[in-house]
Amino acid sequence: MGILNKIFGTYSERELRRVNPIVNKIEALDEKMQSLKDEDFKLKTEEFKSRLEKGEKLDDILPEAFALVREAAHRTIGLKHYREQLIGGVVLHQGRIGEMKTGEGKTLVATLPAYVNALTGKGVHIVTVNDYLAKRDRDLMAPVYEFLGLKVGVILHNLNNEERQEAYGSDITYGTNSEFGFDYLRDNMVVYKEERVQRKLNFSIVDEVDSILIDEARTPLIISGQGEKSTEFYKVADYFTKSLIAEKDFTIDEKANSAMLTDEGVNKAENFFKVDNYADAENMEIQHHVVQALKANYVMKKDKDYMIKDGEILIVDEFTGRAMEGRRYSDGLHQAIEAKEGVRVERESKTLATITYQNYFRMYNKLSGMTGTAQTEENEFREIYGLDVIVIPTHEPIARIDNADVVYKSEKGKFKAIVDEIVERYKKGQPMLVGTVSIEKSEMLSSMLKKKGVPHQVLNAKYHEKEAEIISHAGEYGMVTIATNMAGRGTDIKLTKEAEEAGGLMIIGTERHESRRIDNQLRGRSGRQGDPGESRFFVSLEDDLMRIFGSERIQGIVDKLGLAEDEAIESKMVSSAIESAQKKVEGNNFDIRKTLLQYDDVINKQREIIYKQRSEVLEGEDLKDQIRDMIRDVVYTAVNSHISGVEEEFETELQNLVNYLEDICLPKALVKVKDISNLSDEEIKEKLLEAVENIYSNKEKEIGEEQIREIERVILLRVVDTKWMDHIDDMDHLKQGIGLRAYRQQDPVQAYQFEGSEMFEEMIYNIKVDTVRYLFHVEVEKAPEREKVAKETSTNYDEDSVKKQPIKKENRIGRNDLCPCGSGKKYKNCCGRMA
């Protein structure tokens, strides 16, 4: 591979050779654009739109359009895209990922493809990781777009529906991945089409694309309502788990991040919970609570995985070190942690709507992305999203010096060496950014530096409100900044002249992350736009990566050398062993994400069908034919399922059939068994269908054409939403237990696909049955009103939260409340009779 690259160039180099002629055309138009008057820019936009309407393609107008944006940026914000940024713009327009190093002006690059694709009138979404960056980027670039005659909006978490509609109606919309995803889910829960906020998903430019499409890929967006289970069991399981002895009663698997009972632990569980067989299926709930309590107490670490703030458990994002308010672990783990820490245990939630980022972003007609680090995950981008990665050359050569890793025997020796290094460089005024993997480690390092009298600033989940401000000062003379992982990503670290003379920004990594990409991101904070800088990672054999995934070979080398605690080893062999450990973990994580996607694809196809049907109900003026089809399906299926063809049982089967249909759509005693006992199966179907259709026709006349059509819509929406929410729950339960199928020589994914498909077909039939049942029992005294099955009671999340979960509460109808179908009767005397 290396020899071929030397002869033909890398994939990126070959692709860039194709892009260069386009960039030459853009640069050649520079003089022409400079000669335009300010008022000509809006006219050019109208001209481009007109040319597109007449059949020209975006690629035909691209050179001129890019050149126009370039000049507009120069006149409005004083920035002119340089050649490398033009290359980046072309790559994004082509629906690819552009790897652009920190400080290369990604925000400015996005204006080029955003403008060109907005000319179609279908909208462009520019996606970033938090509200601060979305608003900042929109405010910075709005003058450029507005000068060109385009409207630009931003989606922030505190906007109301009208403001969201206006922002999405803009030509270009900035916002966070979670806001875009949640708005899609909410749009598919509305009861009037006018309440929707998003248009069809057209073109998306994802900033920090690796963070959103890979780090976040395993995290589903969930809109949830309050569950009904008691929380007492979590406290009981926690009490039991705290009485166990490590290794004797339970074991911990650090690679799998899990804990499980030993045989001795199982005996203790059976005695404690007073059950004969802990593994019995009827004790599944006990098993579930014990497993989560074990994980909460012995795997999840305070100030690393979560933190406590004002009596609330907040998840800490492992990639950014941010606390994610409003987001909760699913499947009872959050409740188990609450029980462990002695804070109030909240009830488990019920999922009302959910989607993963993988499936949300794959719905766009065209997807592109920017990041400083994508190449290490190129295979995943290509395989899952169909995106290739093109490395964009830097404007200035990178002057940063990346030193080899230094490896210590113990963590204590490593941190002592880090502090010595910081003290040494602080004396000469060199600014330093020190990356840690957890709040706990950053606070430990902070206290060590305080003892040495080194002034510094700490940036972790506890102080993220000041994130951008803290990080922007990190390049000043003598400034020492300790930050958890990728905190402050998206904010440039600019060097002062004195800091530059002191050697530029020094990056110190206190531990290797399990992903090379995260390490590269930390390194990339230094050496922006040709600035001087340096980086070095300090590693110990006690670090998680080395301990869990590192090879025994490294341990062997260190043992042979007989290193003391504070002695270091620096060798290429050690560095390559570390890299192979990282590759092993990355491959493992990719496989996990691929498998999860296979599961999610099952429910994703089902989601698309349900949301499409829902949309047709909202859009359609008349559901008459659809309802008639449902009535026929219910009657025909009832006949097929009740009549077996066994003569001796025919009379009994007919009676059961009549009873069944009387519960759904036939008035009592309208059809008697003797009326149909001499008919064939097909004649029975026709006779029953005729009777049922006549009843419905009379109901239409009685209620009135206009009113019955709205009632059909109200009832169908309500039934679809209720059944879909229950189905999500059922699919979740199926997935939780499906892994055990491997013991039966069954492929769990295939079993999930097959059984999930059967459950979906059953749900579709039940939607028909319930819709018909409600329609035949409805009596109207006032005009019906549509009502959401789930009402949003609060959206408790922080603007920087990457994985937000609005807490939505299911709207329960009291038995004495008015029935939502619009009959004017109490629920218990109307639709509640069938509930």
UniProtKB/Swiss-Prot annotation:
**GO molecular-function annotation terms?**
ATP binding; metal ion binding; protein-exporting ATPase activity
Sites where the protein binds ATP: Q85, G103, E104, G105, K106, T107, D492
Could you tell me where this protein is found in the cell? Cell membrane; Cytoplasm
Q: Kindly give the InterPro entries that the UniProt entry links to this protein.
A: Helicase_ATP-bd, Helicase_C-like, P-loop_NTPase, SEC_C_motif, SecA, SecA_CS, SecA_DEAD, SecA_motor_DEAD
Show the catalytic activity: ATP + H2O + cellular proteinSide 1 = ADP + phosphate + cellular proteinSide 2
Q: Which GO terms describe its cellular component?
A: cell envelope Sec protein transport complex; cytosol; plasma membrane
* Annotated Zn(2+) binding sites: C819, C821, C830, C831
Co-factor binding details: May bind 1 zinc ion per subunit.
Q: Which UniProt keywords are given for this protein, alphabetically ordered?
A: ATP-binding, Cell membrane, Cytoplasm, Membrane, Metal-binding, Nucleotide-binding, Protein transport, Translocase, Translocation, Transport, Zinc
Task: Please state the protein's primary subcellular location.
Answer: membrane
Q: What is its EC number?
A: 7.4.2.8
- Tagged with keyword Chloroplast: no
Enzyme group, top EC level? translocase
What is the required cofactor set for this protein? Zn(2+)
Give the membrane topology, semicolon-separated if more than one. Answer: Peripheral membrane protein
User: Tell me, which GO biological process terms does this entry list?
Assistant: intracellular protein transmembrane transport; protein import; protein targeting; protein transport by the Sec complex
| Taxonomic superkingdom | Bacteria
Q: CDD domains from the xrefs?
A: DEXDc_SecA, SF2_C_secA
The UniProt entry's sequence similarity note says: Belongs to the SecA family.
Record function comment: Part of the Sec protein translocase complex. Interacts with the SecYEG preprotein conducting channel. Has a central role in coupling the hydrolysis of ATP to the transfer of proteins into and across the cell membrane, serving as an ATP-driven molecular motor driving the stepwise translocation of polypeptide chains across the membrane.
Under the subunit heading, UniProt states: Monomer and homodimer. Part of the essential Sec protein translocation apparatus which comprises SecA, SecYEG and auxiliary proteins SecDF. Other proteins may also be involved.
Name of the protein this chain belongs to? Protein translocase subunit SecA
Q: Which gene encodes it?
A: secA
